[in-house]
Amino acid sequence: MKSKKFKILVLPSDRTGVSKFRSVDPHTYLQKMYPDEFWVDIKYDPPYTDDNWWKQYDLVHYHRSIGPDYDASKVVAKKLKKWGIPQVMDLDDYWLPTPDHPAHMMIKNAKVDQKIKDMLMVSQYVTTTTTEFASEISKLNKNVFIYPNAINHEEKQYIPKPTPSPRLRVGWLGGSSHIKDLEILNGVFGRLHRERAGKFQTVLCG
């Protein structure tokens, strides 16, 4: 008799960015590599109140929250625990950005930081990216594990295309939320230009 497949529900927080590397791709490859053992469903709008729908799964994985409705997500998380269905919460960013972050006040006013902490406390397991963040998370949930982003180095954006140059190239990549990080380099490139003019190239992306 053919054994029953282990059914996993994956609930990404968005359709790009972090969800690709920490929710969608890892589980897509899991099913691809072990098709006889795992079945993975990816859902962006879960039916919070349909108990029978949730009960069909053997494990639920979500990033930050089960869905955009944090209160409903917390209720579902407690039900999953009662039903004996393991749940794994993934979190890669601190729940409250620094005051210079564009989204700081929006998150603070909507109490999203507290809602994320509430989800951490009701989840059975948590996965994250670094030992430093894992240490912080462990103050709220001791069952925390560290996993790197699932990057497929065969995707075209990661395939190196070396371009010969006599210059030393320095690259920096960041978005609008990284302005304060960029300020740390204030004066560095001016000094490099004075001391190494024509010997280096700076590329800013973002």
Q: Locations of the language-model features?
A:
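A short helix->loop->beta-strand "cap" motif at the edges of active sites that frequently abuts
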Residues: 82-86, 141-142
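An aromatic- and histidine-rich active-site surface loop
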Residues: 63-82, 173, 182
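Structural motif
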Residues: 58-59, 86, 125
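N-terminal pre-catalytic "stem/leader" segment of glycosyltransferase-like enzymes
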Residues: 1-67
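Donor nucleotide-sugar binding/catalytic pocket of nucleotide-sugar-dependent glycosyltransferases
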Residues: 121-158
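Membrane-proximal helix-turn-helix segments that form the acceptor-binding/catalytic region
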Residues: 78-82, 106-125
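Acceptor-binding helix/loop patch of EC 2.4 sugar-transfer enzymes
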Residues: 27, 88-116, 154, 165-166
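Conserved catalytic-core segment of nucleotide-activated headgroup transferases in glycan assembly
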Residues: 14-29, 150-158, 162-206
